[in-house]
Amino acid sequence: MGRAGCRNYGIGIMKLTGLLFFFLVTTIGLNAQNIVFVYENKVYQSNIKTVQCFNTKKEQSVPIYTLKSAETLTFNFDDLKGGNRGYSYTVEHCTSSWKPSKINSIDYLESFNEDIITNYRYSFNTLQKFTHYEIKLPNEQIKPKIAGNYILKVYENANKSRPIISQRFYVLDPVINVGAEIVASSDVANRYKIQKVNFTIFHQMPIQNPYLDIKAIVTQNNNPNGAILNTKPTFIKPGSLVYNELNANEFWGGNEYRKFDTRSFRYKAEHVQDIYVDTINTAVLFNDVNSSGPKYSNQFDENGNFFIRNQDGRNPSTDSDYAKVIFSLNAIPPNEKGSIHVLGQFNNYSIAPANKMVYDENRKKYFANLKLKQGLYDYKYIWLSEDGKIDDTFFEGSFFETDNSYQVFVYYRKPGGRWEELIGFSNVSSLKK
């Protein structure tokens, strides 16, 4: 090849390289722009792990605090990329159905409307390096002044178009009381499988139209999936609203959660079959089977929660390492058109490709591989049908005796008001203790 040919060939390579670079940059830019923010508990980047939000008084409690009190929320997460990536955050007031209230921040904040996360620490003596971030709410920079639902938004480099985390929390102004109880269903066929929630709102405030001004939402184990909305009280009495309609607020009791213990990688604790240590820790769990038998078996669980713990170090937040946790399920699905997922509070009960199980034809089992921080974990298996319906009883069973916690949130919108406020809350166990 002559000099001219070499020169033309080199120019062609440079043009091709330039086009590839342009395509790569454009693709990355489009992907960043295509991130859709949602008003639910969600992680938007795979390097973000172990998101927690709870009332500081009790770890993994419902993320709710009382307005104008000394209570705070603790919110934290890990970034597996390490370093300090300059995360900022803001909060936004929402409706009872978790949609934007569409009011100005000066209506719901008595402070600034955004801040930088300055409290962070680096992991110590771990194979998986990470940075641990934490904030307390409310604080001097972010301080809600009205009750209601709020969404916490974390984003990178002060760019709100690049969301990192969205996290729901609640601010309560307890002007009413809520009494709740768990009873058997009137449905004879399923009364040994279903738990029914009856509740009463006790108030001294004037409520002009309970059908329009009051909404009550009931959840099981602080799981937003399957939340039930109540807009019509069964009985309206002086000073109280009664919600005990037949077949209303009924939940499958489910079963006690499965669990495992990875507080140490030096020995095999509960439900851990093997531990391997290489460039990263690997914990292989014992094989699981279908638990939907005819009889209830009592065992202690944490109602789907998880707790970061570490017996190999001192500080659970920074000394707890990560591991690839291998789940396996030997069970026959209801049909071939659907998928099995591993869910718990550790992944917000959210169905995603990361927690989908894959069938191994050679071993005749379903497997999932999740990267999780050391600790105590509850989990369960659910079936997602082809039409998007969730069945969390097929692999687990359902029993009235199962211990579950139920949350009742009561919202009030003043006549002519522009937003809803959270005025009542109750957290009740299905077991009488």
Predicted regions located by residue number:
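Ligand-binding face of N-terminal immunoglobulin V-set domains in extracellular IgSF glycoproteins
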Residues: K129-I142, A147-N157
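Bacterial Sec-dependent N-terminal signal peptides
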Residues: M1-I35
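Low-complexity, Pro/Ser/Thr- and charge-rich linker/hinge segments at domain boundaries
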Residues: V36-V38, V171-Y192, F399-I423
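Basic K/R-rich, polyanion-interacting modules in nucleoproteins and related proteins
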Residues: V284-E336, L422-K433
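Aromatic-rich carbohydrate-binding modules that target alpha-glucans
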Residues: E110-Y133, N225-P233, I326-Q374, E386-R413
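Contiguous beta-strand segments within globular domains
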Residues: Y44-H93, A189-I201, R314-F327
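Short acidic/polar inter-strand loop motif in beta-rich domains
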Residues: S96-W98, I142, E156-R162, N223, ...
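Short, compositionally biased P/S/T/A/G/V-rich stretches that sit at domain boundaries
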Residues: Q33-T66, D173-V188, D301-R314
